[in-house]
């Protein structure tokens, strides 16, 4: 099955009074009416299953007046810069969309943060789709200074496919020295009805994170929408991940991953590069400047 997009090219025009009104109206709505969200967790998948770190569940109290003042100042500054640039229709649309999605990300994450640890990433492209958007939630069922039993779920949109996962895990904390845990999860591809089961283990220290996952398919052959007269199913496999930094130089970090999958034609590198029992090694080096302190 082929996929294609059709659209119309919009004429470009100089910044008009109408565009200015639309921009200011959007900003006013965001300031005066914070986003109200209701959410029913639909927990279910991700190709990667690195569990979110244990974050503080403490509440941060901020007065409504301070939030409004900060929002007004921020929006006014951004709007002033935007209006002075004499933007066209595309710039106006991008500005409005960016401001709206940023506010939505903030409001949803703060609301979900009342119940657990949440990570929200909403993206809206020029077609107003949710491509590369994701929502992850970790909820502690039993939480003490030394042990935590939790459930975690996620849903995300990648490559025109919607995938989800749900899982349970247990972590043991040895003071401030290290953490070890195990987890089990179910991945489900909502777009193609593929399912797999996974188990994992993790070990963390202040400067090092180690994890390993195994994947077992739970669904059979199905017709592939990408290749004519072809069937597909999840591949069994496993991966090992390491992430850390130098204690003496914390701004310099690195990550390393090895993954292995089994099958005659596994598309680890894409549907057009299928291989037998493929494996891959990926590495990344990051540098985070140390923020300056203020007196």
Swiss-Prot record:
List the Pfam families hit by this protein, alphabetically: IAT_beta
Keywords, alphabetical: Signal
**GO BP annotations, alphabetical order:** cell adhesion
Q: Name one GO cellular component term.
A: cell outer membrane
The primary gene name is: eaeH
Gene3D superfamilies from the UniProt entry: Inverse autotransporter, beta-domain (2.40.160.160)
Please give the superkingdom of this protein's source: Bacteria
Protein name (Swiss-Prot/TrEMBL): Putative attaching and effacing protein homolog
Which family does the UniProt entry place this protein in? Belongs to the intimin/invasin family.
- What residue stretch is flagged as signal peptide? 1-25
